[in-house]
């Protein structure tokens, strides 16, 4: 099932997308995804799907979680091909993790909606980059969970573009600031629930810039997979419902080309994951 956050007549709401992908069924009394996560175990989805239906073209999709309660937890260098690519970039290489994942956080003032603008910050940034990523949404509090049970704590999956300012990212050694400027977190177009998206299956993950294929990989090329990451993060640290974990990006980012292929105002960035859909945004 696909779950959306949308705006109609100036008001935001959440709903279920019908099977054809043509209409949204609002969830009565539920104005944001965090609330939907809370009632999801008891929600009568069949009743919602029998209720009011809004044509998809008459609503404006928002990021599924427009204002995350916490910073996004991100993984760095978590695809084998991206690890090789990163090591080849002179002066900027980071060796692939072989024992433990690389974690960092990404501040999100407001996630960018599907069709929304990526801010170029031309006054600060000369090397704007894109990163198509699978994002995991936690559905119930996870603490000291076993890897075998980790997927029981997942609410759903979406696409996140981990937009990055490379010079700032590397100037500060820690990646936080270079990943966290306003307009650097496109997310969407919706959340897909686990019964529709089995994360254990390999899925195509791609990005295109102005129609040109840049990233083209599969999720089985991850170094550390979703169950392991949830289990490890939960050891001694509670993952609350609504926590977002972004699983890293494959090769084909702009910095990996010679010369680099940075983003510029007017560029259209499309990130796709098989089984979820496509998240499209324009650089402004």
What role is predicted for each listed range?
Residues 1-97, 101, 268-270:
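N-terminal non-catalytic cap/leader segment that marks the start of a structured domain
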Residues 4, 62-64, 91-94, 119-128, ...:
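A generic local secondary-structure boundary/capping motif
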Residues 91-112, 130, 264-275:
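Structural signature of FAD isoalloxazine-binding scaffolds in flavoprotein oxidoreductases
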Residues 112-150, 155, 160-164:
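Non-heme Fe(II) oxygenase catalytic core, chiefly the N-lobe of the double-stranded beta-helix
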Residues 93-106, 149-177, 181-182, 222-225:
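Flexible glycine-rich active-site/ligand-binding loops centered on an Asp-His dyad
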Residues 63-65, 71, 96, 126-128, ...:
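Residue "hotspots" at secondary-structure boundaries inside conserved domains
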Residues 9, 49, 60, 82, ...:
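Catalytic-pocket segment enriched in acidic/His residues
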